[in-house]
Every structure is written in C-alpha cells, then in structure tokens.
UniProtKB/Swiss-Prot annotation:
It comes from Ruegeria pomeroyi (strain ATCC 700808 / DSM 15171 / DSS-3). Pfam families: Amidohydro_1. This is Dihydroorotase. NCBIfam families: pyrC_dimer. Pathway: Pyrimidine metabolism; UMP biosynthesis via de novo pathway; (S)-dihydroorotate from bicarbonate: step 3/3. Its cofactor is Zn(2+).
Length: 346
C-alpha cells in the first residue's frame, strides 16, 4: 500500500483570490502548495482591461508572503464592450493567460457578464487568431431552465455553437459538474479541455441537502446527482490529459455563507491536495494524480511543467482548521466529511 507519493508541484487552473484583507488571508493557502494559478477576474469592479489586470497582479505579488514562490496567471473578464486590441495586447505581452466568459447572472459578481453572445463574436474570433484560450462558466441563466440542467443546456445552446462558429478557439469548460460535460469533452478531442473541482469529485447534491442544508457545500455550478459525480471521478482519474484541476476555491466571509440567502462557493484551498489524494486513492488511481494536478493543465495551456516537486504522505488523520481569520471576518474551511490521511510533507 502506497504511503508516500512525490509529484511535480501542482497548479490550480481556476482560483478566486479576492482582494484586500481576503486576498491577504487566502493567498498563502494556495501559494504553500501550488506554483501557479489562473486567477479569476470577477472582482468588484471586474478586471476588464489589461491595465486592471496588471494592477491586480501587482497587488497579488505585493501581498505574497516573503519566501513563497507563486505565479498568478491573470485573466480578463469578457464583456460585450471588451476591446479586442486591448485584449490582444495583454495576451501577446504575457500579461494575461486567458479570458473568462461569465454568462450574466450565472455566479458571484457576474452581472457584467455576457447576455448577447453575438456581441462578443468578434472578440472570440480575435482570440482564436492570437491563440488566447477562453475559460467558460458553462451555465445558462434563463429562469425557465432548472438549475440542475443549466450546464447541459449551455453546452447545446451556447458552447457548441460558439465552438462551431470559431473552430480555432481553445476552450476550457471550467468546473464541469455533469456527465454531459465530461462526455462533451471526451467527444471533442481538439482544442477543448475541462477543469474539475474538489467538491464536485467528493460530493453530490444529497450531501448538501439531505438532513438539512449545508451552506458550505453550496457552490455554482451546484452539486448534481451521484451519477454525475461518478462520471467526474472517472474522467479525473482516467489519465486523459483534457481533464485537469481547477479548485474554484472561492472564499466568502462565514457570515455570508451562513445566511438566509447564502453566497456560493467552497473554500477548499487549504486541503485541496489532501482531498484529491483521498479521492484518487479511493478510485485506485493514485498513479494518475500527478497528471490531473501537475501535468495536464500545463500541456493544455502550452506552458512548462514545474521543475520542483512536492511529497504527499499518508499518516494519522489531518487536523483541519475550521476557520481562517480574514481581516475582521473569518472564512470557513471546506469540510471533507471524512478523515483525510494524506498531507503535503515537503
């Protein structure tokens, strides 16, 4: 039985760092284990220009504790007013790594997102020309569509037409939550990848709802049925390089999560790798963990893998802190619901 596993240092291909006191609180939790992360641009106001991306990157680097080695990979928030020239300049210079598409109203701070996809077609065409990837929050927001069906409908109504109209565009389906999403990636070998979160590999909607509502498991896209979770585990542990880790670790003050109308997001960064080792061990696929966390993402983005390594060791259950101080507030750490025996030891 494997008791120790050394892998290339991982990257997180979907991360929320926030800003200000929250940024200062959560950044070390990612930088401790991850070398790079795709940083989400849905601040208030959102990061919509190259200048704003540069300023946000500078704030992140200024906040990074001394001695920690971490590279934020910046993104732009796509709007119907996005300037293709500004976007192209930011990407060509290496300032941004990708562009994020939020359908308006789909998730936290997405009000500035896209309503009319025809209005962003010229931008998408420019992105295809310059090789800038598009990260997609894949849900429709029509009120008549059930929240549990929004991903599948998005694939049919929005994503597939976008990809057919812009065949050179490289697309990342972020935080896929359904068998539909996993199957769509599997059926489209060129220019399409997908990130998968910790919570969607560990839990289904019963874990969130049965016996009482657990707000710290509430995220968007929402947890789905068990067979969808099983399909995600199969995809993540398959060794297929089109699937890679994007934690979507999304911190909110505890009072905003434990509220009558609670915020969406799970703060998984402190224990993400321990959770993943548990999932992959349960699936008999520890040998595939390095690909999912450390190799597949760089391959899709055309970036080098990290030179350094980390070691995960199996021992007595990990002592998981319940909360993390964040300025005047606290952030509740994701509860895995089971003892975690794997931890990063070096």
């Amino acid at each position: 039985m494997t008791q120790s596993l050394t892998i290339r240092r991982p990257d997180d291909w979907h991360l929320h760092l926030r800003d200000g006191a929250m940024l200062a609180a959560v950044l070390p939790e990612t930088a401790r284990h991850f070398a790079r992360a795709i940083v989400m641009p849905n601040l208030v106001p959102p990061v919509v220009t190259g200048a704003q991306a540069a300023a946000y990157r500078d704030r992140i680097l200024a906040t990074l504790p001394k001695g920690m080695n971490f590279e934020p990979l910046m993104t732009l928030y796509l709007t119907e007013q996005t300037d293709p020239d500004d976007l192209a300049a930011a990407h060509t210079s290496g300032l941004i790594t990708s562009v994020k598409l939020y359908p308006a109203g789909a998730t936290t701070n997405s009000a500035s997102g896209v309503k009319d996809f025809d209005k962003v077609r010229p931008v998408l065409e420019r992105m295809a020309e310059i090789g800038c990837p598009l990260c997609v929050h894949g849900e429709v927001t029509d009120r008549e569509i059930d929240i549990f069906d929004r991903e599948a409908v998005f694939i049919d109504r929005v994503l597939d037409p976008i990809r057919r109209a812009t065949p050179g565009l490289r697309v990342i389906m972020e935080h896929i939550t359904t068998k539909d999403g996993a199957d769509y990636v599997a059926a489209n070998p060129e220019g399409l990848g997908a990130t998968i979160t910790v919570q969607h590999l560990m839990f289904d909607r019963n874990d969130m709802l049965v016996g009482g509502m657990r707000p710290h498991y509430y995220c968007l896209p929402i947890l789905k049925r068990r067979h969808h979770r099983e399909a995600l585990v199969a995809a993540a542990t398959s060794g297929d390089a089109r699937y890679f880790l994007g934690t979507d670790s999304a911190p909110h003050p505890t009072h905003a999560k434990e509220a009558e109308c609670c915020a969406a997001g799970c703060f998984t960064a402190p224990i993400a790798l321990s959770c993943l080792a548990h999932v992959f061990e349960e699936a008999g696929a520890l040998d595939k963990l390095e690909g999912f966390t450390s190799l597949n993402g760089p391959a899709f983005y055309g970036l080098p893998v990290n030179a350094d390594t980390i070691t995960l060791s199996k021992a007595d259950p990990l002592d998981i802190p319940k909360t993390l101080p964040a300025g005047e507030h606290t952030v509740t750490v994701f509860d895995p619901g089971v003892p975690l025996h794997w931890r990063v030891t070096r």
